[in-house]
Amino acid sequence: MNDKNYEIKEKILSLPKENETDVYHKELNVISWYGKPDKLDIRGWSDDHSKMTKGISLSKDEFIEIARAGLEKLGGKE
């Protein structure tokens, strides 16, 4: 583990910055915090990953439950 207390294991999705002045872009990553089991993580990152915004880390089951609820609320399909 590195001195940053996290390790990005896999980058799944990177969304573009909303406008030219944004410092951070949102990413969905598989990440390990403090050597603990991998979680799905959504947060903003600087281009070089030296800085991050507050975000949320979820287990697979938590992620599925939240995605399902969001799709149902918006009228989407699973």
PLM segments and residue spans:
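Positively charged, low-complexity terminal tracts
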Residues: M1-E78
